[in-house]
């Protein structure tokens, strides 16, 4: 979401999927340097990491590199997850139809680019759950959930989910 990138994280808004892909690859290169002792030499279009001093080198992790997870909604970020990550975090606004018709094919395209398959990517995602100890709490929770869904529905980046159902406008 552009507002988060520019105003929350104070970063330039350009090519978010390409930047994320490169950030994940750079992170993997750093972990590889730590785990193998290889000289760090990552050079990309957005990031460059070529110095790993002994002071910042934690040494080999006996458990290996951590699993990488990425959330996404649109096809480009979802493809990046399929290409580079171990786990894809589906957005709570994602529907079963959108997951089957848009998300999974995008994950497959990304995985294929990296010589992987969909089975190499764990898919996880949150649900909207409404609970309460009594009717009043339940109604309050329902209203909060409705507001959250309405917010997501009004966010242009999530429009693809609505369009998948024919609810674009």
PLM-predicted stretches and their roles:
Residues 29, 86-87:
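Well-ordered beta-strand positions
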Residues 9, 13-59, 101-169:
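An alpha-helical appendage that flanks or caps ligand/catalytic pockets
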